[in-house]
């Protein structure tokens, strides 16, 4: 990670904290918040039941540029294409709970329409029995 990316991540993390400081957070929201703010080395594990009664298990990586927290902060949080707010990020689990799913060999893509916006959450499927599903991205249809 270069210095410019580090500076952007620091600025966006501060903006994220400022945006959510007055919200009452659920336990789930707090876990997402902690992943985005504290970014410990160990990934955060999530287990969510979707509307089809499938239990979806995945990790949210906090230290990789190409997926998870850093990808969302750099590419989609208050950004250009696919813009999402801190509030929407805190509630990304609702996209799995309430959204439609499309599964291919590599990914589960959940799509959920709310307030005229379309949100997508992509979970990369594990490659082996010992592997782990990884949250790749979360974004909207905002341009």
Model-based region annotation:
Residues 1-143:
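Ribonuclease/tRNase effector modules and their secretory precursors
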